[in-house]
């Protein structure tokens, strides 16, 4: 399985096109990337959690799009590392619950090793939260399992400015519940980001099997 890191920000709609092609040919890979500012609503979205009108937001450079993934509204923006595993669960004989639990555990272990952060899950609200303050969310999750081939994934807040998050109640919560590595006073620079990605590769490898060398691309 290839791991690909994009050096340039990938438009969200471009990613949606990519994921459909990957699913069609059941081509496994794991993508690491950032998006330009966008708000997305999952299949369980509550309209009241979009605090400003779609037309106004788009006039401010924040796109709004509705997608086939679990969850409510969330946001993507520069400074947030998005990890999209595309995994053939049928071929690998992996139960959905096992996949989700191990995906989150990979993030938990990688964050602990990289920054000494202790993160926990919340059975009532998907994502990862600080163990020291369980109201503070640092990682969002939303996955699609169409045809037992995964798409979408997790979004980990490194040093994003939360401009897009201010326009929603992310997953029904107040945007001020969101935090990031930078807001916690920790190093969110390039070297630490690369270290986190390396640990993610190792942890994903532990339950998905052999993963090839990380590939960098500018497309």
UniProtKB/Swiss-Prot annotation:
Family membership noted in the UniProt record: Belongs to the LipB family.
The organism's place on the tree of life at top rank: Bacteria
Record-level Gene Ontology MF annotations: lipoyl(octanoyl) transferase activity
Active site: 171
Stored CDD domains: LipB (cd16444)
Biological source species: Leptospira borgpetersenii serovar Hardjo-bovis (strain JB197)
UniProt site positions, description: Lowers pKa of active site Cys: 137
Further remarks about this protein from its record: In the reaction, the free carboxyl group of octanoic acid is attached via an amide linkage to the epsilon-amino group of a specific lysine residue of lipoyl domains of lipoate-dependent enzymes.
Annotated function: Catalyzes the transfer of endogenously produced octanoic acid from octanoyl-acyl-carrier-protein onto the lipoyl domains of lipoate-dependent enzymes. Lipoyl-ACP can also act as a substrate although octanoyl-ACP is likely to be the physiological substrate.
GO biological-process terms attached to the record: protein modification process
Binding site for substrate: 69-76, 140-142, 153-155
Domain BPL/LPL catalytic, chain residue ranges per copy: 24-212
Protein name: Octanoyltransferase
InterPro entries xref list: aa-tRNA-synth_II/BPL/LPL (IPR045864), BPL_LPL_catalytic (IPR004143), Octanoyltransferase (IPR000544), Octanoyltransferase_CS (IPR020605)
